[in-house]
Amino acid sequence: MADSRPKPANKTPPKSPGEPAKDKAAKRLSLEAEGAGEGAAAAGAELSALEEAFRKFAVHGDARASGREMHGKNWSKLCRDCQVIDGRSVTVTDVDIVFSKIKGKSCRTITFEQFKEALEELAKKRFKDKSAEEAVREVHKLIEGKAPIISGVTKAISSPTVSRLTDTSKFTGSHKERFDPSGRGKGRAGRVDLVDESGYVPGYKHAGTYDQKVQGGK
């Protein structure tokens, strides 16, 4: 026997044709807002001029360095190249003492945060006539945007031995025949005795001038 009771009506109202479009628009706005938030986070993650300089000096001379930690040698170079060391208020000894004080007992490097602490220590000595905050800002200005200075490029040193082996004008024998007066190699002509079939004896300097002499005499 079939159930004659009336079925309850569906209370969920049907969606209008325009509602799917509204849902898509809301979803798009949500995604755009998330993208903007990620962009702001990325912008905030950009390196400051001070940290960028720190990383450049941290990787100097070490291809395997990550740039997140700095050795004492590079710390000293940074202080020299950026003129934190002035030879009066701040010396190389001061720089070494501060580095040993800031780094951990069992560590050989300092992080960027420790680097800033070390600069605060040196700022007190470098700019004694300024307040602590002003002194730190002045030290930061000395370093921001800087990079390691490459110096001590090896120069060629001339010696009698090197000159004898490389100066073609001093070559003798068969070696001399391989180069022209300018020092340029003659190629195959300088290595192989080529047969001269011109009819002139070797060493004759007026080859090919007979016709000119005859015509000039007429």
Swiss-Prot record:
Its EC number is 3.6.5.-. It catalyses: GTP + H2O = GDP + phosphate + H(+). InterPro entries: EF-hand-dom_pair, TPP/p25. GO terms for biological process: astral microtubule organization; cell division; microtubule bundle formation; microtubule nucleation by microtubule organizing center; microtubule polymerization; myelin assembly; negative regulation of tubulin deacetylation; oligodendrocyte development. It is an enzyme of class 3 (hydrolase). Residues 1-115 are annotated as: Mediates interaction with LIMK1. It comes from the Eukaryota. Its cofactor is Mg(2+). It is found in: Golgi outpost; Cytoplasm, Cytoskeleton, Microtubule organizing center; Cytoplasm, Cytoskeleton; Nucleus. Homodimer. Binds tubulin; binding is inhibited by GTP. Interacts with MAPK1. Interacts with GAPDH; the interaction is direct. Interacts with LIMK1 (via the PDZ domain); the interaction is direct. Interacts with LIMK2. Interacts with HDAC6; thereby inhibiting the tubulin deacetylase activity of HDAC6. Interacts with aggregated SNCA; may have a pro-aggregatory role in synucleinopathies. Interacts with DYNLL1. Interacts (via C-terminus) with S100A2, S100A6 and S100B; these interactions inhibit TPPP dimerization. Regulator of microtubule dynamics that plays a key role in myelination by promoting elongation of the myelin sheath. Acts as a microtubule nucleation factor in oligodendrocytes: specifically localizes to the postsynaptic Golgi apparatus region, also named Golgi outpost, and promotes microtubule nucleation, an important step for elongation of the myelin sheath. Required for both uniform polarized growth of distal microtubules as well as directing the branching of proximal processes. Shows magnesium-dependent GTPase activity; the role of the GTPase activity is unclear. Belongs to the TPPP family. This is Tubulin polymerization-promoting protein. It comes from Bos taurus.
